[in-house]
A protein has these predicted regions:
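Short, glycine-/Ser/Thr-/acidic-enriched flexible segments
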Residues: 56, 134, 170-173
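A C-terminal junction/extension of Radical SAM enzymes
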Residues: 90-167
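Low-complexity, flexible helical/coil segments
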Residues: 21-23, 43-51, 84-91, 114-123, ...
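Conserved non-cysteine loop/helix-boundary elements of the Radical SAM core domain that shape
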Residues: 1-114
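A broadly tuned preference for mixed-charge, low-complexity surface segments
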Residues: 4-5, 64-66, 131-140, 178-182, ...
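Radical SAM enzyme core and accessory elements
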Residues: 143-217
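Generic domain-boundary/flexible-linker signal
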Residues: 21, 62, 91, 138, ...
């Protein structure tokens, strides 16, 4: 199991807690799915939990953000990240940016500020921040943590000091080596058929990279 392999935290990322919005953005999970998984993890494991929410989704209102923060404050996951919607070229939501159902920038800013106020009132503190291109209202993504529950991995990622091993089509792995923090990346093919045909060679290449960077035998 993950616990036996040393995993100590898990991300459960609802994005928002309204089924109509989840369907609108093409997510395959429901609010019930999120809650059942969270309760299972809390009741049966010692894993720390991170939850991600997005401000600025299609048809999203301030009432929706209030519902999201109500859920967080009732369940108190160790880490919470509030993202601002970033409409990237090529993403399924990109074509929606000219439609009226994307919230106005001032409303998105109010959602982000409300999330900050609710989380801090519940005992969370901000501990990392980053920005992306195309973010609504030139805002940012902010990670919050309960006291003594900060995820060091997130901090290291922001500082470009963290290796990442990813799996599956379209995934991207990154190797970092101290003290100079040189990095090397490997990108998996997005096409599933190409991925299946080339997976053995890609895994062999990954093993060689691991040996070179981490002196794995």
């Amino acid at each position: 199991s993950m616990l036996e392999l040393g995993v100590n935290r898990i991300s459960i990322n609802p994005q928002t807690m309204q089924d109509n919005i989840l369907r609108r953005i093409g997510r395959g999970h429901s609010v019930r799915d999120v809650d059942e998984l969270l309760q299972y993890v809390k009741n049966n494991t010692s894993l720390a939990v991170n939850m991600d929410f997005i401000a600025g989704l299609p048809n999203q209102t301030m009432s929706n953000m209030i519902e999201n923060m109500d859920y967080v404050c009732q369940n108190l996951p160790e880490n919470v990240t509030i993202h601002t919607l970033a409409l990237k070229r090529g993403s399924p939501l990109y074509d929606l940016q000219m439609q009226d159902d994307i919230p106005e920038e001032n409303l998105v800013a109010e959602m982000v500020q409300y999330g900050k106020a609710r989380l801090e009132a519940a005992g969370y503190v901000p501990y990392y921040l980053y920005r992306q291109q195309y973010m609504r209202g030139q805002l940012e993504n902010i990670g919050y943590t309960l006291p003594d529950k900060a995820c060091e991995y997130n901090i290291q990622i922001m500082e470009e000091r963290q290796s990442i091993l990813s799996m599956g089509p379209g995934s991207s792995s990154k190797w970092m080596r101290a003290p100079e923090y040189r990095q090397l990346k490997q990108h998996m093919p997005k096409d599933v058929d190409v991925y299946h045909v080339t997976i053995d060679a890609l895994l062999e290449k990954r093993h060689r990279i691991c040996e070179r960077f981490w002196e794995v035998v």
